[in-house]
Amino acid sequence: RDHGTFLNLDMEDYKDLDLTIAVFTAILDQEDMRGYEAGIVLQAYLPDSLGAMQRLQEWAAKRVASGGSRVKVRIVKGANLSMEKVDAEIHGWELTTWPSKQATDTNYKRMLSWAMTPERTRNIRLGVAGQNLFDIAFAFELRAARGVEDSVEFEMLSGMATGIQEVVRRDTGHLLLYVPVVDPHEFDVAISYLVRRLEENAAPENFMSGVFDLASNEQIFARERDRFLAALSDLDPDAPVPVPNRTQNRLAEREAGIPEETGTVAERAKRPFVSEADSDPALAANRQWARDIAAAIPGSTR
């Protein structure tokens, strides 16, 4: 803070969502941090992200109204899908992300559209992060139409499609490059980052898989154009705020009680065994359930 360093809290796993927001707001609520501008990342492939953006906007509005500085939210699509799939499969949980790439792309545009207004950018400035030229053009035009050029900047990954980055920098006036830095003696911590970049370049549903053929191959261009238009056609600003995919609630289960088994042993034996899903600590109700159990331990006789 004293040296003018900008701190941005990144978002990795779904389980970090609530914790990262809580840490971010708690630190910036400290009196000596009220004038410090920091940032946080939200991943559009999580249905939870629009609601999280709205909660951050409400918090930031109060912060600015009381004399504090605004903050920054970096909007990304999300690059940890494989990890989220593994996590869900291992623990018996619902997948945290949207069911399709198109749904993620639609939510990305909805988050930008919701946040990119003069009233809201007074509290939160935006980082539009991504490599998709159609999405960058969408955000660029939306930024101009809403008159919020000074509150929205574009961000791309350093080293990926550098020719495109030069064009984006020239046309938008500014480009922030996301650069990973790691101690050479701890290079293993960068492996997951490199794997995600390889996956982005190889997966056919990702824009980067055809980026080098975009100008010369009409089919590739049409494919990406049609994907963009399909996601845009699903955009409904007035639709209800998406709810999380995971709804496990041990607290509600405890209050409702365990239903009595009414079937016979023979009937149960015909059904395949399905293990009870692990309790998900990423969910607020489950965390409260765990706290209640811990609080009851000193006086428990069982």
What is each stretch, according to the model?
Residues 30, 117-118, 275, 279, ...:
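Polar helix-capping/helix-linker motif
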Residues 14, 287-294:
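Short alpha-helical interface patches
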Residues 293-302:
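Glycine-rich loop-to-alpha-helix module at the N-terminal edge of alpha/beta enzyme cores
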Residues 264, 271-274:
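Extended boundary segments
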Residues 1-264:
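Positively charged, amphipathic and often flexible ligand-engagement surfaces
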Residues 263-266, 280-282:
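Low-complexity, Gly/Ser/Thr/Pro-rich intrinsically disordered linker/tail segments
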